[in-house]
Amino acid sequence: MDNYQELAIQFAAQAVDRNEIEQWVREFAYQGFDARRVIELLKQYGGADWEKDAKKMIVLALTRGNKPRRMMMKMSKEGKATVEALINKYKLKEGNPSRDELTLSRVAAALAGRTCQALVVLSEWLPVTGTTMDGLSPAYPRHMMHPSFAGMVDPSLPGDYLRAILDAHSLYLLQFSRVINPNLRGRTKEEVAATFTQPMNAAVNSNFISHEKRREFLKAFGLVDSNGKPSAAVMAAAQAYKTAA
């Protein structure tokens, strides 16, 4: 009979081959959202106009969603022409395509700094409006009103501060998830949170933007002070999430 304990010990004693492991990491790499690749594709397809086009795509993502063909059905003639041009120029897809394809949501997430700034202007055109959020927590921070905000969160903040920011952001995600997914409307807070916690944490812990730059963004947004302490509005939203149903 095999001695499985001994086999496990012998296996652990084998030398670690760094090159072999790195090769496997490349082979098994997640073929989904990659902010660097998104920006690379934007520049490749858009040339000198990529930044202006990206701004348009962010507005579309925030106000109309991730399905450009469907949104064109109810849009002005000028708007349809603009969206059609973007679809053709950037080969925009819907759903969850390969790593080397663009969607409106991916553009908004990759350029989260710009997306969060646009939210201040567009908050009343979102699926869950700023007015609605103010009803849940006074002066709810507009910069937090999109899933891409998680990419701006500095994970090196002190634990209590980090938790408060994530809870405040989760207050929006809770409402947003129930609006865009009817199947979640009768679910508990914990059940709904289970659908957005993993992608939120993945964005927080990504290495695309440094901790220092993220902290600068949070300060510029008025969400934390020079010590990383959350603002009163953030703390109020965090408390509202804790007591939300």
From Swiss-Prot:
The keyword Membrane is assigned to this record: no
Subunit structure: Homodimer. Homohexamer; ring-shaped, necessary to form the nucleocapsid. Homopentamers; opened pentamers in solution. Binds to viral genomic RNA. Interacts with glycoprotein Gn; this interaction allows packaging of nucleocapsids into virions.
UniProt-annotated location(s): Virion; Host cytoplasm; Host nucleus; Host endoplasmic reticulum-Golgi intermediate compartment
Function: Encapsidates the genomic RNA, protecting it from nucleases. Displays high affinity for single-stranded nucleic acid. The encapsidated genomic RNA is termed the nucleocapsid (NC) or ribonucleoprotein. The ribonucleoprotein has a non-helical structure. Serves as template for viral transcription and replication. After replication, the nucleocapsid is recruited to the host Golgi apparatus by glycoprotein Gn for packaging into virus particles.
Site (Important for dimerization): 125
Name assigned to this protein: Nucleoprotein
Region feature Essential for oligomerization, mapped onto this chain: 1-71
Effect seen on changing residue 178 to E: 90% loss of transcription
Binding-site positions, RNA: 30, 33, 66-67, 70, 99, 105-106, 185, 195
UniProt-listed Pfam families: Tenui_N
Family affiliation: Belongs to the phlebovirus nucleocapsid protein family.
Domain remarks: The N-terminus is involved in homooligomerization.
Keyword vocabulary terms for this entry: Capsid protein, Host cytoplasm, Host Golgi apparatus, Host nucleus, Ribonucleoprotein, RNA-binding, Viral nucleoprotein, Virion
Record GO terms (molecular function): identical protein binding; RNA binding
Main location class: virion
Alphabetized InterPro entries for the sequence: Capsid_Phlebovir/Tenuivir, Nucleocapsid_Phlebovirus
